[in-house]
Amino acid sequence: MKILFLDTETGGVNPKESALIQLSGIVRIDKKDVEEFNFFIKPFEGSEVNPKALEVQGRTLEELDSEKYKSEAETYFYFKKILDKYINKYDKEDKFIVAGYNVKFDIEMLQSFFKRQNDNYLFSYISSATIDPLPCIGFLQLCGILPVLENNKLETWCNYFGIEFQA
């Protein structure tokens, strides 16, 4: 089984307009972590970069202009190399299952990122199946098995379950 653990940090919540600022993940194949990546990305021209989003992430606008942050085109090139290393995009059965917390958002951001690079084929690499605890939490709350907490943020649930949280 091929799993792509994925997390994004963005300049807002609109996949088409918000900047993708950070793309991080782990590639796991047959229960072994085989690669990790962490890309810092310069906002694309005209993109939304909400100061509150940066504050939550502990970033500044000035930081986004540093050499640490690469263009979307450069990031796309290196990220695609990772995908191509592990997936045969022409094989319908060879896909990553994407895993993460609220991973639907991350996939939407990634899909917009691909489209800005004139690539409509993200789903040649990833399955429509995902692994995401957030929908399970919502269902278990509706069933009365889990309590309704102040919010459904990952950190809140980690604290509830006594799991160390590292942002």
Regions found by a protein language model. Give the residues of each.
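Short coil/loop linkers at secondary-structure junctions
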Residues: 59-60, 120-122, 146, 164
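Short, surface-exposed recognition loops or helix-turn segments adjacent to catalytic cores
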Residues: 95-96, 124-131, 166-167
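Active-site catalytic microenvironments for nucleophilic, acid-base chemistry
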Residues: 113-117, 139-143, 160
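Short alpha-helix plus adjacent loop in nuclease-associated cores
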Residues: 130-148
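A structural motif
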Residues: 145-159
